[in-house]
Design a protein with these regions (language model features):
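Periplasmic binding protein-like
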Residues: 46, 114, 253, 383-437
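Extracytoplasmic/peripheral linker and loop segments enriched in polar/acidic and small residues
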Residues: 102, 297, 387, 391-402, ...
Length: 472
């Protein structure tokens, strides 16, 4: 479902639209100590619903990780809050012919360890994302690329397999973060994940697992020093302690705020809540390789048994809409004429009967705060499944375990995900998740793959719309 996650950002303190981008509350000024004692470091403290599981930007797409990795690392392009694509580490780009893109890179940029940024780093970073040996979490994002050349230190030439008008936009989000070739090859992936080095406005200075990560401002940032000295990200998985920390002034921002708790924040004179429609969906991932979820009739029954309107009304206080498919409202080729996903428990029972379902366990794995309301939604959905005769089990797992299961594709049944529409196009969410090698690649369908591949390469928007309509 599409929801209003009650978003908050400090774009004057953190760069870009991806700085925070999730639920939270924001004090009306910096912490009192920072205002009163200007000789001390100006510190921003954020509490989120779980630890940062991965600092390596090519090995995570989860909210708890990427809102910080997009500030440690830069992309060649950057999508700003105005929705437009702006220069990042690339100052300009142009299409030559139908499938060759040339990017001019920003000069004088340094990584946090002092190494200069060059086209060699850009080439290495992008190729790493789709290298089968690397097994990254963003393997589907840049697979339209055929080859990359770096003719000089500040020019990058990318040849796509077929025309790809979305390439500059792809490079501005998941998978497009630039990592330092020399440093990563020297220290290896494990050390790089623990001690990441980027070109972004903050750099990691310490990390205590399941407690906090500390970032200091990059004084040499090419975009100018940000308006703070230090960023502290605390892990507070439970909602009540997270809210209490905010109200006591121990933190400045909290994320993953349940809608039914908003009044506690708005009722306090020093805190406030802001919201915006989330550019994505809350979806249930499915391990279709595991019985009984390998039976399409069982999956259809599970979908038909979910009363999404009730979830939006009761758990989200009306802050959301029921989607009509895997394309987010507002994206290219969103079809408003399609009805919302159906709720029909009687038909759900019929399909379970046709499937020969005999009470096998169906697991729904959830955290307590990876996405706001994930555990209450899981419990509500499981109850709806039980009502139609499904032996549904909810298992609560730690966020770090969830992240590992996502990387290794070892979910035992179903799980929550909150994919973001990264391109304003089905290719940026649906294909990224469900395409070959994507995070939800527990299934394959020849027609889906055929049409998805054809649509992502086509410049014929009429054909693209028809293709996406068929496969959704």
């Amino acid at each position: 479902m599409e929801v209003d996650p009650m978003s908050v950002t400090r774009r004057d303190l953190l760069k870009g639209a991806a700085a925070l981008g999730v639920a939270g509350a924001l004090p009306q000024a910096l912490p009192r100590v920072a205002r009163a004692q200007t000789t001390q470091k100006r510190e921003l403290v954020v509490a989120q619903g779980g630890d940062i599981a991965k600092f390596d930007p090519h090995f995570s797409t989860s909210s708890n990780d990427i809102r910080w990795s997009f500030n440690v690392f830069d992309n060649l392009t950057s999508r700003h809050p105005d929705g437009k694509l702006h220069p990042g580490l690339a100052t300009e780009w142009k299409l030559q012919g139908q499938s060759q893109w040339t990017f001019k890179l920003r000069q004088g940029v340094k990584f946090h360890n002092g190494d200069p940024f060059t086209s060699a780093d850009a080439k290495y970073s992008i190729e790493r994302t789709y290298d089968p040996a690397a097994k990254t979490m963003v393997a589907t994002v840049l697979t339209t690329i055929d080859r990359i050349e770096a003719p000089d230190p500040y020019t990058l030439v990318i040849q796509t397999k077929k025309p790809d008008p979305l390439l500059p936009a792809r490079l501005g989000f998941y998978g497009g973060q630039i990592v330092p070739k020399k440093y990563l090859e020297t220290v290896g992936g494990d050390t790089f994940n623990a001690k990441p080095v980027g070109t972004g406005p903050v750099r990691l200075t310490s990390w205590v697992k399941d407690d906090r990560a500390v970032f200091d401002a990059n004084a040499d940032y090419w975009g100018g020093k940000i308006d703070m000295d230090r960023l502290v990200v605390r892990s507070i998985p439970e909602t009540a302690p997270r809210i209490a920390a905010l109200l006591k002034g121990e933190v400045d921002i909290i994320t993953q705020l349940p809608p039914d708790q908003a009044e506690r924040i708005t009722g306090n004179t020093t805190t406030r809540v802001t919201g915006a429609l989330y550019a994505g969906l809350y979806v249930l991932g499915v391990n279709s390789k595991r019985p009984p979820l390998d039976n399409p009739l069982v999956k259809q029954a599970l979908s038909l048994a979910i009363d999404r309107e009730a979830i939006v009304k009761e758990l989200w206080r009306g802050r959301g809409i029921v989607p009509n498919g895997p394309i987010a409202k507002g994206d290219n080729h969103y079809d408003a004429s399609l009805p919302p996903l159906a709720y029909n428990p009687r038909e759900a029972r019929e399909r379970l009967k046709k499937a020969g379902y005999k009470g096998e366990e169906v697991f729904l794995e959830t955290t307590v705060a990876y996405v706001s309301q994930d555990k209450p939604m899981a419990e509500a959905v499981a109850a709806m499944w039980r009502d139609v005769g499904v032996n549904a089990k909810v298992e609560v797992i730690e966020y770090s375990v969830r992240a590992q299961k996502g990387r290794e594709k070892t979910f035992k049944g179903m799980w929550w995900s909150d994919p973001t529409s990264t391109l304003g196009d089905p290719d940026g969410m649906m294909w990224r998740l469900l395409g070959p090698g994507g995070p939800m690649d527990y299934w394959r369908d020849a027609r889906f793959d055929e049409l998805g591949n054809a649509a992502r390469f086509s410049v014929d928007e009429k054909f693209r719309g028809e293709a996406y309509r068929e496969i959704t």
